[in-house]
Amino acid sequence: MVKSMKTNNRKGGYSASTANEYIDSKQAIYCLSTELETQIKFEDGQPTGEIIAYKAWFTQKGLPPFQVKFPSEVALPNYMTMVEFDNLEACEVGYNVYFRATDIKEVKY
């Protein structure tokens, strides 16, 4: 069964416990992105050109693809490589779930 990535219960701010409600730590996570997407800072509705974060897409069995934001540029592994995150946290905003982590590592079998 595919779980929805819509919120279960809304709480404020990012937390590891919220991430654990959505991501199963016993299941493999795979990298879908082959390059990072940049997030640009906006002021007064206009882009400043300043990069404030990097994002990439991942998947886990039973979940829709999900995006994780990183505060600095990370080295993405190859497409469909099994990965794990450093300090994965999630935040529920409205009915959406947003993820962030400090780094990513390839899982060696």
Language-model regions, residue ranges each:
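OB-fold and OB-like single-stranded nucleic-acid-recognition modules
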Residues: 1-109
